Regions:
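Conserved, mostly hydrophobic/aromatic
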Residues: 22, 51, 82, 96, ...
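Short, solvent-exposed loop/turn segments at secondary-structure junctions
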Residues: 26-30, 65, 84-86, 110-113, ...
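Structural preference for beta-strand elements that scaffold enzyme active sites
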Residues: 19-21, 76-78, 102-104
């Protein structure tokens, strides 16, 4: 009860606060040491229980309408998923249904027939690389230690951070060259 009161008071608009939109990407069946930023099913379920007890979860379309009308409940939140990974349906959806929580899924339709996003290609290329170092100096992305899950995560973060804002063609070309170097 105290936390509910405090969270309402801390909201920029008080008890009739604005909408919090919670964005998720992946929910893995089990923890992945390389993708430790992604939740596993147990972590996701704990978060959903917590959210359900401290927030009023509202479907996104209803939340937007009620926001415009000024009729949102206190501590209103909407749950969303970006990119439309298959695990959203196979892992996250059953947990959401169990807790009767609505969610909105934004699907990257360009990958419905196969293929994967450039960042996932980088992740999987580095994950599959059996070397302990990945030399990408020839494509101006440095040299990276990748002998452990921690090192692979660090390399992935650094490389994605370096190329994510490049023009699409340049980003895709570097991703292809990285894939070749990692194989």
């Amino acid at each position: 009860m105290i936390l509910r009161t405090i969270s309402g008071m801390l909201s920029p608009a008080g008890r009739n606060g604005l909408l919090s939109i919670l964005i998720f990407h992946r929910v893995l069946a089990q923890r992945d040491p390389v993708l430790d930023w992604d939740l596993d099913a147990g972590d996701f379920e704990r978060r959903m229980r917590w959210l359900k007890s401290w927030f009023n979860i509202v479907p996104l379309d209803e939340a937007v309408t009620r926001l415009a009308q000024g009729s949102l409940p206190a501590r209103a939140a909407a749950i969303t998923f970006d990119d439309g990974y298959a695990d959203n349906c196979t892992v996250a959806m059953p947990i959401l249904q169990k807790h009767k929580l609505p969610a909105c899924f934004f699907v990257a339709t360009g990958f419905l027939d196969g293929g994967r996003m450039w960042n996932d290609t980088i992740i999987e290329s580095i994950r599959a690389c059996r070397d302990t170092h990945l030399d990408l100096a020839a494509i101006d992305l440095g040299t990276h230690a990748i002998g452990s899950a921690t090192e692979k995560r660090a390399a992935i973060d650094t490389i994605i951070g370096r190329i994510k804002y490049l023009p699409v063609n340049e980003r895709l070309a570097l991703t292809e060259k990285l894939t070749e170097a990692a194989s």
